[in-house]
């Protein structure tokens, strides 16, 4: 069986892979289905003139908020804007069934920021990227629904 690397597979292949894993998950753990819909969103911060101060990109999936990125302009750092974006994203996530949050950050980025906002370190992967480390943190957002 030939296996090839494809950096840009067709939409049909991407869709078939997504449907395949969703079907496997549904068959294996039937009650996962209500939580499988991905909800992608952004929390955007602007100043009074509409200039971009920063943003957060997140996805709600399997009752978990995945914070994919958070960026702040230099002039917005230390002003509470990042905290507001996190709080708004977490509130949105809870409204959409999320009970926890997960984020990856690197050694030169924002681990102390996330910890200050209630995130706990799960693991550190040294040497990713080379000479640095990736940190994985999580936070409980809400009690599980019965």
Label each PLM-derived region with a short phrase.
Residues 102-104, 120-138:
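Conserved catalytic-core motifs of GNAT/GCN5-like acyltransferases
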Residues 70-77:
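A short, internal acetyl-CoA/4′-phosphopantetheine-binding micro-motif in the GNAT/acyltransferase core
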Residues 78-91, 116:
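Conserved acetyl-CoA-binding loop-helix of GNAT-fold acetyltransferases
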Residues 43, 54-56, 65, 70, ...:
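Conserved GNAT-family N-acetyltransferase fold
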Residues 17, 114, 119:
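Conserved active-site tyrosine of GNAT-family acetyltransferases
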Residues 1-11, 143-146:
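Conserved N-terminal entry element of GNAT/NAT acetyltransferase domains
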Residues 34-35, 48, 56-65:
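A conserved beta-strand-loop-helix scaffold within acyl/acetyltransferase catalytic domains
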Residues 93-106:
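Conserved GNAT acetyl-CoA-binding A-motif
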């Amino acid at each position: 069986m030939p296996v090839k690397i494809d950096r840009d597979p067709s939409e049909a292949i991407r869709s078939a892979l997504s449907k395949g894993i969703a079907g496997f998950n549904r068959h294996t753990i039937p009650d996962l289905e209500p939580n499988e819909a991905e909800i992608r969103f952004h929390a955007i911060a602007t100043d009074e003139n509409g200039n971009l101060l920063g943003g957060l990109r997140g996805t709600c999936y399997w009752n978990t908020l995945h914070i994919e990125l958070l960026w702040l302009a230099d002039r917005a750092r230390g002003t509470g804007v990042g905290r507001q974006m996190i709080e708004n994203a977490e509130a949105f996530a809870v409204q959409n069934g999320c009970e926890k949050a997960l984020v990856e950050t690197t050694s030169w980025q924002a681990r102390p920021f996330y910890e200050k906002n209630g995130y706990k370190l799960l693991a550190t992967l040294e040497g990713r990227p080379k000479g640095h480390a990736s940190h994985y943190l999580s936070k409980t957002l809400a009690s599980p629904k019965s």
